[in-house]
């Protein structure tokens, strides 16, 4: 399966989890309290990290792809960062960067 990935930075993670769960339907599949939330729907992989200093912004775009074994990054013609990665790679990265998923 291949899903569009959108990564956002927000300054209020709890409010974002509530709002985006209503918008997307399901609750996040992964939450690191106070730091990170991840939703996986058939259409989108949406990750949100709490970064008060950065405020609300687009961090990067990409694709979650079951057929990919490693992470790759590139920039498009507008300078936006795009990533390609497997769900397994992302799950390991969440634990490494943000801590255990609750």
Predicted regions and their residues:
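Vicinal oxygen chelate
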Residues: 3-11, 37-42, 51-102
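Short acidic, gly/pro-rich beta-turn/loop elements at beta-sheet edges
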Residues: 17-18, 49, 71, 94
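A short local loop/turn or secondary-structure capping micro-motif enriched for an aromatic residue
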Residues: 47, 54-58, 89-93
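Core segments of cupin and vicinal oxygen chelate
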Residues: 1, 7-46
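Short alpha-helix boundary/capping motifs
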Residues: 48-49, 102
